[in-house]
């Protein structure tokens, strides 16, 4: 990179995000961290792959969602060729957190809300994207929000039903991996994950909206169960307090009436 000393510095390859045709880097541009995506050297000189990368830029540049990493530019860089430039994400990938068994209740909640929201947005924009996997999901250091770092390489007027079913299957597979390392059992979420990954596509959720409704019902049920548990606990506590108080009243001597006092 001829401009490395002035414009670009501290270029670092990110092998965990390597794709079939592309490499991903973290680099400083004028002192600010960004991420680059470029074709591998063996594909960089081929027009068909250049067109593929440019089309991905065109598709992703128009995406604007809080849980999808924003694209900033499409630029030629010496030694790398044309590159897609995106915001840098400070944080850990979901894969890293799964491997470390560091899945918090807060993150589990984000996976039930933010991730389906992002998938719904992608489908609404008719984006055919790469299979969803934990490596593509970043958890930000600040806010602990979810960010999809790599979506979109084709755009159609309509999506096939299979595209939606594949998204649902991959979501369920990710949810299963998360639940395996989560400290407590989540039977209702496990049921949702099992339905997402049912071998028979006809038995899965038909679309992301149906999936989101199932998750919302699960959350509502959890709230109701918590309320019921609280009421039962309070009833037991009140019964116990009454049982403690009753013997004291029984053992107290009878107070004389006014007539007896006379």
Give, region by region, the residue ranges found by the protein language model.
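A short, aromatic-enriched beta-strand patch in the conserved N-lobe beta-sheet
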Residues: 73-75
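ATP-binding glycine-rich phosphate-binding loop
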Residues: 2-29
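Protein kinase catalytic-loop region centered on the HRD/HxD motif
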Residues: 117-127
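AlphaC helix of the eukaryotic protein kinase fold
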Residues: 43-62
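Activation segment signature within eukaryotic-like protein kinase domains
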Residues: 111-112
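AlphaC helix of the protein kinase catalytic domain
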Residues: 93-103
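Conserved short submotifs of the Hanks-type protein kinase catalytic core
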Residues: 78-93
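C-lobe/activation-segment region of protein kinase-like
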Residues: 147-195
């Amino acid at each position: 990179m001829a401009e490395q000393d002035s414009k670009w510095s501290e270029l670092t390859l990110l092998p965990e995000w390597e794709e079939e045709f592309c490499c991903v880097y973290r680099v400083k541009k004028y002192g600010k961290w960004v991420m680059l995506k470029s074709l591998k050297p063996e594909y960089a000189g081929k027009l068909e792959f250049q067109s593929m990368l440019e089309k991905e830029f065109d598709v992703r540049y128009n995406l604007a969602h809080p849980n999808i990493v924003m694209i900033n530019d499409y630029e030629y860089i010496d030694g790398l060729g044309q590159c897609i430039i995106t915001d840098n994400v400070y944080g850990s990938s979901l894969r890293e957190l799964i491997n470390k068994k560091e899945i918090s209740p807060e993150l589990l909640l984000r996976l039930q809300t933010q991730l389906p929201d992002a998938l719904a947005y992608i489908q609404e924009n008719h984006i055919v994207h790469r299979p969803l996997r934990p490596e593509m999901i970043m958890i930000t250091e600040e806010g602990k929000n979810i960010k999809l770092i790599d979506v979109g390489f084709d755009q159609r007027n309509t999506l096939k039903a299979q595209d939606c079913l594949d998204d649902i299957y991959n979501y369920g597979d990710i949810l299963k991996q998360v639940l395996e390392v989560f400290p407590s059992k989540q039977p209702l979420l496990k049921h949702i994950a099992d339905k997402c990954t049912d071998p028979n596509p006809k038995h899965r959720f038909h679309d992301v909206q149906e999936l989101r409704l199932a998750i919302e019902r699960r959350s509502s049920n959890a709230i109701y169960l918590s309320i019921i548990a609280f009421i039962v606990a309070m009833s037991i506590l009140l019964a116990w307090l009454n049982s403690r108080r009753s013997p004291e009243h029984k053992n107290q001597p009878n107070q004389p009436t006014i007539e007896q006092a006379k």
